[in-house]
């Protein structure tokens, strides 16, 4: 029995633990979820909840005449600021991703995966004492370590029918130029780490040629 329970942990067959929280670190039911949200006591990944506010969601931003290029520049500036500050203060970042979803539990979520668990723990402690954009930062350790399982494969293929309210991650891409700049900077600072993986939010290629696989129930 113990072996069976271990094999289904965090899957749709698990009626005790929430598979969405296990895979994505967020669940649309929040504290009202009928299944357990097992918050990790250690992890390489941290979640900064709802940190990014897109221009069209920002009451202080004039978006009437904003072009896609201008919107991308705003996002790139945000991404670079967070990435550079977190890596310089807390430690080497393996990847950083920002959700482009619209659901309250995912909108603007920033996931940062550090190389070391100790750095992630330090980041959570320090960031929870910080403010960003006039709002307090809410940071926590996240169970997400494999973003391939957390991301919507249909979205990556341009086939997601749920739009921004999909319960799997729709990642917002950064520009190719920024991607090269950030990860080359890190490579020079920390050396060529075999464990380093670039952000799945890199530009242009976020819709990959992969066959969609079943995800189970999307509550």
Map each language-model feature to its residues.
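Cys/His Zn-binding finger modules involved in RNA regulation
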Residues: 1-219
């Amino acid at each position: 029995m113990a072996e069976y329970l271990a094999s289904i942990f965090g899957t749709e067959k698990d009626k005790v633990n929430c598979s969405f929280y296990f895979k994505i670190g967020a669940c649309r039911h929040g504290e009202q979820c009928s299944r357990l949200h097992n918050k990790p006591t250690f992890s390489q990944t941290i979640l900064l909840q709802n940190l990014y506010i897109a221009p069209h969601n920002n009451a202080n931003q004039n978006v009437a005449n904003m072009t896609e290029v201008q919107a991308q520049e705003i996002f790139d500036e945000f991404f670079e600021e967070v990435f550079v500050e977190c890596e310089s203060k807390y430690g080497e970042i393996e990847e950083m991703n920002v959700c482009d979803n619209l659901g309250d539990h995912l909108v603007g979520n920033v996931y940062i995966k550090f190389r070391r668990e100790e750095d992630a723990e330090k980041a959570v402690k320090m960031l929870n004492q910080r403010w960003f954009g006039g709002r307090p930062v809410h940071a926590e350790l996240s169970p997400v370590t494999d973003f391939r399982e957390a991301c919507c494969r249909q979205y990556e293929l341009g086939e997601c029918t749920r739009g921004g309210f999909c319960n799997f991650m729709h990642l917002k891409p950064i520009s190719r130029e920024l991607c090269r700049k950030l990860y080359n900077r890190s490579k020079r600072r920390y050396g060529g780490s075999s464990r380093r993986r670039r952000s799945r939010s890199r530009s242009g290629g976020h819709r990959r040629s992969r066959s969609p696989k079943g995800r189970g129930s999307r509550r």
